[in-house]
Amino acid sequence: MKFLLFLSVALLLTSFIETVTVNKAGMERPSRALVGRGCPAECPDTCSSSGSCAPDFIG
């Protein structure tokens, strides 16, 4: 049982990766993106759960 708890915590921690995105001003800024989320490259940090760009959604 402890192994399953450890495994789920490890998977949760490794599900996030650090990415660097460049905004329109050319400034690099770090953002977090879920692995395998399927967000388009033009909006990696404002992607809705459906995988489409959503300017009002911060995800």
Curated annotation (Swiss-Prot):
Keywords: Amidation, Cleavage on pair of basic residues, Disulfide bond, Neurotoxin, Secreted, Signal, Toxin. The keyword Lyase does not apply. GO terms for cellular component: extracellular region. Residues 1-19 form the signal peptide. Residues 20-36 form a propeptide. Expressed by the venom duct. It is found in: Secreted. The keyword DNA repair does not apply. One of its GO terms (molecular function) is toxin activity. It comes from the Eukaryota. Contains 2 disulfide bonds. Its main location: secreted. The modification Isoleucine amide is found at residue 58. The cysteine framework is XIV (C-C-C-C). This is Conotoxin Cl14.4.
